[in-house]
């Protein structure tokens, strides 16, 4: 059965300008999509509803403790993006990466990988160039990262955006993943 619905602007998330694949600037307006009977037809509506439900229930507890001035509880999230940077030549030899974007097979971790030599090591010049370009692209969208560093495994790195309201952080996380792939695949 097909659901009919309507699209509404999610004014809790900021609109932004993002380049289309052909470099045309496009205004993106965050939206929600619901059926005429109220069912969520997207993934954002349940998030917004759960944020509101959490606020309502938390306010009950806050009032039990005697606080009569609070009006709302706002949740925040600061998701980390851990990622691997793989050279194009290596990528082209790995069908699992090509078809799924993930490692489906491989070898056990080399002995000694649990040591901190990569984690505390300096960031390689090519990786730092990637991180710099990534930050510049994210800043254009109003997304700021708090930290970026090597992770434990070889070629593994991390980007940690600044905490934000849950729905905005979720929107930013989707954009971060998109921009990471775009920057990594650019020549």
Model region roles, listed by residue range:
Residues 1-187:
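Glycine-rich, acidic/polar active-site loops that bind/position phosphate-bearing ligands
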């Amino acid at each position: 059965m097909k659901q009919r619905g309507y699209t509404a602007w999610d004014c809790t998330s900021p609109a932004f300008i993002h380049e289309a694949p052909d470099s045309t600037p496009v205004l993106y307006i965050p939206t929600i999509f619901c059926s005429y009977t109220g069912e969520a037809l997207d993934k954002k509506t349940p998030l917004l509803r759960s944020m509101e439900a959490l606020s309502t229930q938390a306010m009950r507890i806050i009032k039990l403790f005697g606080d009569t001035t609070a009006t709302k509880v706002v949740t925040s999230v600061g998701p980390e993006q851990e990622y691997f940077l793989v050279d194009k030549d290596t990528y082209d030899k790995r069908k699992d990466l090509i078809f799924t974007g993930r490692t489906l097979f491989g070898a056990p971790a080399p002995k000694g990988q649990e040591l901190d030599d990569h984690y505390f090591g300096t960031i390689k010049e090519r990786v730092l160039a990637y991180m710099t370009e990534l930050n510049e692209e994210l800043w254009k969208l109003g997304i700021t990262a708090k930290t970026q560093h090597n992770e434990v495994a070889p070629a593994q790195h991390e980007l940690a955006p600044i905490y934000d309201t849950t729905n905005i952080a979720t929107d930013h996380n989707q954009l971060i993943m998109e921009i990471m792939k775009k920057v990594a695949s650019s020549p």
